[in-house]
Swiss-Prot record:
Protein name: Major outer membrane porin, serovar B
Subcellular localization(s) per the UniProt record: Cell outer membrane
Lineage of the organism: Bacteria, Pseudomonadati, Chlamydiota, Chlamydiia, Chlamydiales
Domain of life: Bacteria
Its biological purpose: In elementary bodies (EBs, the infectious stage, which is able to survive outside the host cell) provides the structural integrity of the outer envelope through disulfide cross-links with the small cysteine-rich protein and the large cysteine-rich periplasmic protein. It has been described in publications as the Sarkosyl-insoluble COMC (Chlamydia outer membrane complex), and serves as the functional equivalent of peptidoglycan. Permits diffusion of specific solutes through the outer membrane.
Keyword Transmembrane: yes
Organism: Chlamydia trachomatis
Annotated signal sequence range: 1-22
Subunit: Part of a disulfide cross-linked outer membrane complex (COMC) composed of the major outer membrane porin (MOMP), the small cysteine-rich protein (OmcA) and the large cysteine-rich periplasmic protein (OmcB).
Recorded GO MF terms: porin activity; structural molecule activity
Single GO BP term: regulation of cell shape
Amino acid sequence: MKKLLKSVLVFAALSSASSLQALPVGNPAEPSLMIDGILWEGFGGDPCDPCTTWVDAISMRMGYYGDFVFDRVLKTDVNKEFQMGAKPTTTTGNAVAPSTLTARENPAYGRHMQDAEMFTNAACMALNIWDRFDVFCTLGASSGYLKGNSASFNLVGLFGNNENQTKVSNGAFVPNMSLDQSVVELYTDTAFAWSVGARAALWECGCATLGASFQYAQSKPKVEELNVLCNAAEFTINKPKGYVGKELPLDLTAGTDAATGTKDASIDYHEWQASLALSYRLNMFTPYIGVKWSRASFDADTIRIAQPKSAETIFDVTTLNPTIAGAGDVKTSAEGQLGDTMQIVSLQLNKMKSRKSCGIAVGTTIVDADKYAVTVETRLIDERAAHVNAQFRF
């Protein structure tokens, strides 16, 4: 049985290096791996000894914490209906644009994100009690990247309007088309990130250790760049701003430098995780395998961001959106000339959450002189991620 356990853990730890958010599982035996310090010797006394004090029981560790998520499995968390203009029904020619909101099927409902990445570098600190329990925290910085179908971001615009561009700008009309054949991606800046947690070695038998941990992490980075890759309305915004809690139609100045009532787009990231893991010590190597249950959310307050445009018309247009049918003829005196151009385009950053809650983690810890340790871990199923942890005991 011991040989089988050794084989399974060693295989899992070694195979993890060949496979490849932001919370690692960690080695369940970590509280008891470093039993000596670089400044003070460890104390292996009996907790029930009346001569033992809490000073003897407590020790500190510090080190580097790096967590790199290459693909977090996320989906949108939105309502089934979305308020926008009625769907066009005219088969030929142009039509009068809708001016009232209608409840339509939300194209963002249940959408899966194509890619979600997060990279964290931090300092970690742990308070150890009796070489069995850890209370720890991390302080550092995170940055991220999100990519998904434009329907996940409710990219909408006005199409087929019988009015010219100047009249559309009066804010009387609402978008009637959902653009779902394109891609939206965003990059965040590097922002402060922190996490707290606790880990305990629950059961030990020889060299095997069964442990559990609980962690919580939070960060709120701003959106650094937003790219909309759409043939009908392609644009890029650096440090985008938008409207929070405002329904369509947007203000007349939306997307211009004169826009008011906007705020910086930021993403509020929260995650909590519970895990159970088993390790087996083999001299200086301690491989482990664990399961985890976590929930993560990315909330941008459903901020709506308008396509950048000119405050004044240039050649009777305010954007460089192409004509779909190639028949656009810009004339101020003639209506319907821009009916085949996408107008008043905007999108919103919807709330996202974990699509899968359960995952597995495999890794190994290398301990040197019972004072220093380096842990390497990879996580699968609910995310593809790698973790590196290097620490020492005082």
